[in-house]
Amino acid sequence: MIGLYKVFDAHVHFYSNAYFKFLVKQKPNRADISTELRNLAAKGHIEIPGEDPVQLAKRWVDIIDKWKLERLLLFGSMPGDEESVVKAVQTFPHRFAGLFTVDPNSNVLMENAEKRLKTDKLKGILLYPSLYQIGVNDEWLYPLYNLVQDCKGLVFVHFGKLILRPRDYAGIPTVTNDQFGNPKDLIPVAKKFAGIRFIIPNFGAGKFDEMLEVGKSCTNVYVDTAGSNSWMAEHPSKPDLRQVFQKTLQVFGSGRILFGSDSGMLPRGYRYDIVDNQLKLAQEMRIPTADIKKIFYENTASLVDGI
């Protein structure tokens, strides 16, 4: 608890050892795995964790205990690394819940998703339409949405500008197709699959106005506040974070906004400056205490715990 407020961070990447190994294996003309991992760590000034995800999970518990946070929603940030998040969540079920990234083009898409949602009890999926170059409204994804809906799961969908630092550090180009990066594509999907709670991270990551349109049209779409929101400097209206919060509150209300930090890299660990700045801003804006509690804890807890 930070002051009066409990914190359930809805956006934390669980960058495991397996994640980094999966990543460097994608690099063309690569050296051996150990060399690539050393090079990646040196370029990014980051730490590659040890092979045991449970030890990494314990480290994250220590980190959030230090900063007096209650819970984290952990992202398995690459297809194939679901098991790391599963082990973290199973070891610390009262501190962590988990999501996993899907590759819509995988021939084991449905088989794996069913296992992770039904057997492993992960809480939902992460979609990157522009990275995997498939529209969020493509009918190919409808069976996946039906499965998530049956499991009362969540769907995080990243739109707008995609920044993938680990790929940069590994020397792997991030090739995206911006035609799949518009949040408005989510409107027909959210209406068709009304039982799914969709979350657009990073206030739309530069597609802020489009994100607001989705919020007006679909009451089952949420937004998270994650990260530094560097997209604001490139947005035509150059909003500051106060204006972003004000407009988002007008459309989504306090009940559909989730605090997130976009933490993940070690040794930096938790981005406490993000939660500190956003909590201070909420108080300076005189957002009612009850609404601040929703944004920073209760909304995410309700989605994850099925309250």
Which residues does each predicted region cover?
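Mid-to-C-terminal alpha-helical segments outside catalytic/metal-binding sites
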Residues: M1-K66, R71, K247, F252-R256, ...
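Active-site neighborhood of phospho(di)ester-bond hydrolases with catalytic His/Asp-centered motifs
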Residues: V7-A10, L74-F75, L99, L126, ...
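Conserved, mostly hydrophobic/aromatic
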Residues: H11, I64, V85, I125, ...
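Active-site environment of divalent metal-dependent phosphoester hydrolases
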Residues: Y15-N17, P79-D81, N105-V108, K161-R165, ...
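Glycine-rich phosphate-binding "P-loop"
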Residues: D32, E36-D52, V157-Q179, G264
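Generic structural signal for well-ordered alpha-helices
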Residues: A57-V61, E82-V89, A113-E114, L141, ...
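Active-site gating/metal-coordination segments in enzymes
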Residues: E70-R71, M78-D168, P173-N177
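Catalytic pocket-lining loop regions of alpha/beta-barrel enzymes
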Residues: K123-G124, N137-L258
